[in-house]
Amino acid sequence: MFKKLFGQMQRIGKALMLPVAILPAAGLLLAIGTAFQGEALQHYLPFIKNDIVQQIANMLTGAGGIIFDNLPIIFALGVAIGLAGGDGVAAIAAFVGFIILNKTMGAFLHVTPDKLSDPTNGYANVLGIPTLQTGVFGGIIIGALAAWCYNKFYNITLPSYLGFFAGKRFVPIMMATTSFILAFPMAIIWPTIQNGLNAFSEGLLDSNTGLAVFLFGFIKRLLIPFGLHHIFHAPFWFEFGSWKNAAGEIIRGDQRIFIEQIREGAHLTSGKFMQGEFPVMMFGLPAAALAIYQTAKPENKKVVAGLMISAALTSFLTGITEPLEFSFLFVAPFLFVIHAVLDGLSFLTLYLLNVHLGYTFSGGFIDYVLLGILPNKTAWWLVIPVGIIYAVIYYFVFRFLIVKFNYKTPGREDKKSSVTTTSASQLPFDVLKAMGGKENIKHLDACITRLRVEVNEKSKVDVAGLKSLGASGVLEVGNNMQAIFGPKSDQIKHDMAKIISGEITKPSETTIDEEVSDDPVHVEDIVETEIYAPGHGEIIPLSEVPDKVFSEKMMGDGIGFVPDSGEIVAPFDGTVKTIFPTKHAIGLESDSGVEVLIHIGIDTVKLNGEGFESLVNTDEPVTQGQPLMKIDLEYLKEHAPSIITPVIITNQEDKTLTIEDVKQVDPGKAIMTIK
């Protein structure tokens, strides 16, 4: 029960990142516009008082402000897309649900435009609808409901006379119905919830604000490894606390209040739950990176320098800390606890110094300049001496503890072989043993990239053993294990099934090819090779592919391809090496030795070949642009979670992969180069 709830919370936290990612762009527009309208910048640059410049500044402020004014609908759309695997139908359903919910609540409560004049009654004008103000929480609820409707009904089958409304078209219909029903209990119970949130947040701040900001910083940092920090900070940033703007509207949430006060040029009272990040991200963590570099073994310092410089710059400029934090989190968890304590103390220190700083994305230098220095509404310069002190503390604490406890931070690892030597014929037996034996197997399956096993007891699975046998990654979702063995996954599954049934009793009877289990093919002799688009469509970053195996590069680097036609073509001159039985994936090797996997859609293995027609055979030579596969795009859109098609280099090793800066492509467009 707990594991299932934890997994759902992680998914929600990740989904919140999509709407949050919009805020930096809005904040940039707002910050620049506000700075040009402010007296501080006008004093040094008097020419910006020009009417045309001020008109542009006003438009910039308005363009940024409109995003913050409509955060509830943005969160509804973003959460729906995030929880539905990126499908736009969920966003349409969320929009339908959002307007129906607000219209129905407004009508049920008899909210009229006249009642909006008193903001204390909890009413607001939402997209032109006089209704009950549910804020960002209301948007998140609608987004989650839309995603539930999508995941529940996207492949529903209806009688033939209602066939037009089957599949994804049924999702907005269900969302309209459920949001209409939801409006009545929401209208009744939400005022009580809102009053409770207000009382809690105001009581928290009034009783001991210093303790509150310390605990916020400390707990938020501790939740990062679990991916739950987005859920934790959302109420503080978007709901807790209130402030009345010049128009008499009640603004809720520390971040929203900060942005509104910056926009109006008002006295700053907000930022308590944001400002503590600046000394840590701009000074503390980069100093920790220096300590990690200096404690690395001499022979590893060159590699560690590259890693730490990149991570430190990322933290300093943007406030993105995960690349640096995850370099020591798992090998030295005590260091991370110390880091969390220092983070909380940073919040407390800036609160005691009466500094009021905020951000739209994170506590990096970019936000520090745009929303701290340029508006010049608070003692922003105090961050610098506090940050210098923090840099000294982080450096010496990290260096001392790393050496004292011999933490295996980057560059200090013990040398050891990462792959167990095993014959190809023995591999299925060893994998079965690592999965806990045949008694532990509840369900066995595979696709072209991974072995999918549902086990009875996850504690019996030897994850490290699976990796030592050649798995490039192991995903754990409840009792479902996914071991990434690449193209040999289906062969391993086939032999494991026969071992379990008793048809195979010794390694010599396995069918897995010897060459498949050898060490990865080396590519030292590969000459520069251009890889072309596998069809007409759009290129997206691999990180946006809604499947961790691909987005986290467990299979290798590459891109995501969103096809807009029903034909997949060869990306280079070469040979077809593998066609999966369900035809949803194809492996190719270029004449120069580059191996590429084209995985058409996400979870399309479950379609059992429906919607795919192979035009080539295994071991058949192909030329760049030659059709490989016909796909029924509409069928895939209706029955697969996503049509995004990862195109992966599976034998890159130490070669350099350059991804071209292109978006809309056709088969004659180069998308990657490896050399």
Swiss-Prot record:
GO biological process: D-glucose transmembrane transport; phosphoenolpyruvate-dependent sugar phosphotransferase system
InterPro entries found in the cross-reference section: Dup_hybrid_motif (IPR011055), Glu_permease_IIB (IPR036878), PTrfase_EIIB_Cys (IPR018113), PTS_EIIA_1_perm (IPR001127), PTS_EIIC (IPR003352), PTS_EIIC_1 (IPR013013), PTS_Glucose_EIICBA (IPR050429), PTS_IIB_1 (IPR001996)
Record key words, sorted: Cell membrane, Kinase, Membrane, Phosphotransferase system, Sugar transport, Transferase, Transmembrane, Transmembrane helix, Transport
PTS EIIC type-1 domain residues: 3-414
Residue ranges occupied by any PTS EIIA type-1 domain in the UniProt entry: 547-651
Active site, per annotation: C447 (phosphocysteine intermediate), H599 (tele-phosphohistidine intermediate)
Pfam families the record matches: PTS_EIIA_1, PTS_EIIB, PTS_EIIC
GO molecular function (one): protein-phosphocysteine-sugar phosphotransferase activity
E.C. no: 2.7.1.199
Positions of transmembrane segments: 16-36, 59-79, 81-101, 126-146, 170-190, 211-231, 273-293, 303-323, 328-348, 355-375, 378-398
Record bears the keyword Nucleotide-binding: no
Domain PTS EIIB type-1 stretches: 425-506
Coiled-coil ranges from the UniProt annotation: none
Enzyme class: transferase
Subcellular location, principal: membrane
Membrane topology, from the record: Multi-pass membrane protein
Localization per record: Cell membrane
One Gene Ontology CC term in the entry: plasma membrane
Superkingdom assignment: Bacteria
Domain notes: The EIIC domain forms the PTS system translocation channel and contains the specific substrate-binding site.
NCBIfam families linked to this entry: EIIB_glc, PTBA, PTS-II-BC-glcB
Chain's role: The phosphoenolpyruvate-dependent sugar phosphotransferase system (sugar PTS), a major carbohydrate active transport system, catalyzes the phosphorylation of incoming sugar substrates concomitantly with their translocation across the cell membrane. This system is involved in glucose transport.
Name the record gives this protein: PTS system glucose-specific EIICBA component
Organism: Staphylococcus epidermidis (strain ATCC 35984 / DSM 28319 / BCRC 17069 / CCUG 31568 / BM 3577 / RP62A)
